[in-house]
Regions:
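C-terminal accessory regions of radical SAM enzymes
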Residues: 130, 145-166
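Radical SAM [4Fe-4S] cluster-binding motif and immediate context
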Residues: 1-134, 139, 152
Length: 166
């Protein structure tokens, strides 16, 4: 997006391997008894097959956990990603829905569609994963009609949690 972390941190994306993360989780769980985690990665699952390998390693190491992530709707609807996330203990995902207006999403350079927001939300809920939306109101050139589209989307999709920026 043209206003998010990418312009701040640049185009470089650094991520630990699933094996490294599973090792860290095992350590934290063993030494501190933690069973719920917030994964601090605003595009969790960006690298192909990362989520699938993460799920496999958690099961192999017998590490049942519950966790929360932030991700993008276009990443989540790829292949078997949602199924793997649900099977590995995902409790809630925060997505940058931002707006129910395609015009506003395009102005933000989100690279997603309103339809993808709907699809992803339905798929996550089918797997009993809570869905939370980050929304923005007052984006440059946003009209009342754009705001009404966002309100309509929220009423139809009924996210479990909402964070609003104005």
């Amino acid at each position: 997006c043209n206003w998010c972390a990418k312009p701040i941190y640049g185009n470089r994306y650094n991520a630990h391997s699933p094996a490294y993360i599973v090792k860290e989780i095992a350590y934290i769980k063993k030494h501190f008894g933690v069973t719920r985690f917030w994964m601090c990665d605003d595009i969790f699952g960006l690298k192909p097959n990362w989520v699938q390998e993460f799920k496999t390693l958690l099961k192999k190491e017998n590490l049942p956990i519950r966790y929360f992530i932030q991700s993008r709707v276009d990443l989540l609807i790829k292949e078997d990603t949602i199924a793997c996330l649900a099977e590995s203990g995902l409790e809630e995902v925060w997505v940058g829905a931002e707006s129910g207006s395609q015009k506003i999403l395009d102005a933000m350079d989100k690279g997603i569609t309103v339809n993808q927001i709907y699809q992803t939300t339905h798929l996550l809920k089918q797997k009993s994963v809570k869905v939370a939306f980050f929304l923005q109101f007052g984006y440059l050139n946003e009209t009342r009609e754009d705001i009404q589209k966002t309100i309509k989307m929220v009423k139809e999709l009924k996210p479990d949690n909402i964070g609003i920026s104005i």
